[in-house]
Amino acid sequence: MTTEHLSQQRFADLPLHPQILAALNDQNFEYCTPIQALSLPLTLQGKDVAGQAQTGTGKTMAFLTATFHHLLTHQPDFITNQPRALILAPTRELAVQIAHDAESLAQTTKLRIALAYGGDGYDKQLKTIENGVDILIGTTGRVIDYVKQGIIRFNDIQVVVLDEADRMFDLGFIKDIRYLLRKCPAPKSRLTMLFSATLSYKVRELAFEDMNDPEYIEIEPLQKTGHRIKEELFYPSNRDKMALLMTLLEEEWPERCIIFANTKHRCEEIWGYLAADGQRVGLLTGDVAQKKRLALLKQFTDGELDILVATDVAARGLHIPDVTHVFNYDLPDDREDYVHRIGRTGRAGESGMSISFACEQYAMNLPAIEEYIGHHIPVSQYDPDSLINDLPKPYRIKRNHTIPHSSRDYKKR
């Protein structure tokens, strides 16, 4: 891992609580990333922050460090088993990842963490919360469920964090977010932080209504895609699209890659071809059960799978190390999703490769994407006669059977 992505700001030179510094030292964190270097001097003083920085630049540790520090330095004069900090994420996977990243800080400080997300573990999550929690990390639906049942009260909240804030304030979340924030103490009585790779003016305007004179921080505003990510664009016909993907996989031979498509059906089709070709490939779509979803991500992270085929459920916030390639089999309909997708590679100072297909169906999305990222994606040509022409017969997922989540789960029937 390179250190070029770090700033000259040392954690040890910040007025951090000694237990926080000890935890950071144990993880060999010496220098801040730019978003940490700009946000921590403010949040450590109790000032609200809305931070925008590229994916993989340390936003999670920025708000976790500030959250733990604030709780340690603002101890209440009463005993409570109710949460003192609320961290909200748009997806279950991201909530789990945040909790994982917080473990080392929790072990050192003895602050209690609990998760609350839908789709799995209702009773287990409930028991953990009832035993007492300092920092609650979760998704809006499950958190609201516990609030309405009277299990959780937010009277003692001192810190609120919205991670991937632009998605949180999407039309589907805004009412839930405002419901929860109205249950918390007033903005002047708490520290509130927003972080995201994309943060539009409209979102900032909505968010600032529930913040206390926040400071807006933006890192590398002129380049929304990481400068360590090499981008490449092909214009395949629909007929050539799968053959081009298989050919590029053979030529590039990526160590670990994610292939994004816009629909579950398309992801299943891609998975079917790659699994039939003998690739170690996993399938991550919205209907994969939560336990399988987490197991699949662990297999991919641990190197048991080389390729992950996914819808945008995997594009936001997940910290999957050493992803060398990202393929946009379909150009996303939402231009911001392009940034989040290719941000799966080129993380923490490493280089990466992004290859996109502007096919007949989705080429119309390209102008909006290029306008948003501020540059044209370099175009490469291909020779149709040089593509792999003996594609395997793809595996098909039968709807009356359990959907396999990786190629090794597949059995021919």
From Swiss-Prot:
What reaction gets catalysed by this protein?
Answer: ATP + H2O = ADP + phosphate + H(+)
Chief localisation class:
cytoplasm
Q: Which UniProt keywords apply?
A: ATP-binding, Cytoplasm, Helicase, Hydrolase, Nucleotide-binding, RNA-binding
The listed location of motif DEAD box is: 163-166
Name the domain of life this protein comes from.
Bacteria
Reply yes or no: does the keyword Transferase apply.
Answer: no
EC number(s) reported in the record:
3.6.4.13
**PROSITE patterns in the record, alphabetically?**
DEAD_ATP_HELICASE, HELICASE_ATP_BIND_1, HELICASE_CTER, Q_MOTIF
Instruction: List, alphabetically, the GO terms of the cellular component aspect.
Output: cytosol
Any GO MF annotation of the entry:
ATP hydrolysis activity
Annotated Helicase C-terminal domain ranges read 241-388
Subcellular localization(s) per the UniProt record: Cytoplasm
Q: Which residues form the Helicase ATP-binding domain?
A: 40-217
**Which stretch carries the motif Q motif?**
9-37
Q: Supply the enzyme class, top level.
A: hydrolase
Q: Which GO terms describe its biological process?
A: RNA catabolic process
Binding, ATP: A53, Q54, T55, G56, T57, G58, K59, T60
NCBIfam families given for it?
PRK04837.1 (NF003419)
Task: Describe the family membership recorded for this protein in Swiss-Prot or TrEMBL.
Answer: Belongs to the DEAD box helicase family. RhlB subfamily.
- Its quaternary structure? Component of the RNA degradosome, which is a multiprotein complex involved in RNA processing and mRNA degradation.
Q: What does this protein do?
A: DEAD-box RNA helicase involved in RNA degradation. Has RNA-dependent ATPase activity and unwinds double-stranded RNA.
Protein name, as recorded = ATP-dependent RNA helicase RhlB
- Source species, please? Actinobacillus succinogenes (strain ATCC 55618 / DSM 22257 / CCUG 43843 / 130Z)
Task: State which gene encodes it.
Answer: rhlB
